[in-house]
């Protein structure tokens, strides 16, 4: 019986792979490893000893990195000779919600804010960076493969909509931060809604839109789960949904977000507002302990994909990472992408 069942499974996989080839779909049981390629304005120079040395445009920064468990290749003296500024953690380090708080120590003259660009073919946008009190600078460079995916799929759907006389595809970016993913969709002629619960962050995203010579992004300052539930009640659909939820957060009216408790509920609501055809979803997760396989299972369960023929959708999942100049790979987040 085991041999017969194995043969049936192998034949099933062969049939599935054949269907993927015919329908130009990627098989959904391969874990992908993706990293930014040929980005002139960003470089991970070295990593190790729980730190990373990065170049953003003309300026080099040292930041804490809990996943850099190995040794640095360059000496501490060499790091400090290269860096313009270094972030050191403060009293909140290790405390929930305050683990990234600390202070920047300037080593060379540099501005508090500066601009870098991202360009890959027709995908071209600018981002204003700044030194925040929580070690972040306004961009997560490892996300570049997600931006490429968002651009390519928004462009594909936009072209198909135009061919059929339909409106531009509606794209929803949840937990949207400073808007790199929103700009990727906008560059592909998406009708973009950008949602974040922090007013100052949305203002920052608007600046990035203007720096990129784009316009007409819809800005929403609201709790993400509340917004999605309302859209579901109204029957509104989107052809692209992007999610990069934090481990913890607060809505503008004090709503509490905890990833472990609310992610699956959020995904169930998102499943109701993603268009059933010619659509895509990108879920990205940074929280420690979350694997690519876990994110894939969450999406598969929320969208009831176990009940659907695999050739009717494409589900891919994997890790995003950065590679330093010494070929050390630094894994930073996991993702799942659904295309149908």
Language-model region placement:
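S-adenosyl-L-methionine
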Residues: 200-240
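C-terminal catalytic and target-recognition region of SAM-dependent MTase-like enzymes
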Residues: 280-340
